[in-house]
Design a protein with these regions (language model features):
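Alpha-helical substrate-recognition element adjacent to the catalytic core
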Residues: 1-65
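Hydrophobic/aromatic side chains embedded in well-ordered alpha-helices
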Residues: 2, 75-76
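Short, structured coil segments at secondary-structure junctions
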Residues: 26, 52-55, 74-75, 93-96
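Helix-boundary and membrane-interface capping/anchor signal
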Residues: 71
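Acidic, Mg2+-coordinating phosphoryl-transfer loop and its flanking beta/alpha structural elements
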Residues: 76-104
Length: 104
């Protein structure tokens, strides 16, 4: 399964990292899709990707744009995000499933 995770509020938490590790161990193809700006905010994102073993080719920055277009283009089947607006847009505009997470 093709699964994607947001960074802020998801992969930058212990719970989000643990879920991503479980999905990877399960054989899922995991991507990172973040609204962060690649030029200014990429180092932390790439560090998380390295820690999880996610290749840089599966890290996508939308640079403040909605994530649903990237999710649709990549054929992502499940996306985890903490932003309700992004969650709703994914559900409204794609065939992908999404889960709204609230991690500490």
């Amino acid at each position: 399964m093709k699964i994607s995770f947001d960074v802020d509020g998801v992969l930058d938490t212990e719970q989000g990292m643990a879920l991503a590790r479980r999905k990877i161990a399960n054989g899922d193809r995991v991507y990172i899709i973040t609204a962060r700006n690649e030029e200014r905010m990429s180092e932390e994102v790439y560090a998380i990707a390295r820690e999880l073993g996610i290749p840089r080719l599966r890290v996508y920055f939308t640079n403040g744009e909605d994530k649903w277009r990237t999710i649709q283009r990549l054929g992502i089947e499940m996306h985890y995000d903490n932003n309700e607006e992004q969650y709703n847009k994914i559900k409204e505009n794609t065939d992908s499933d999404a889960e709204l997470v609230e991690y500490d």
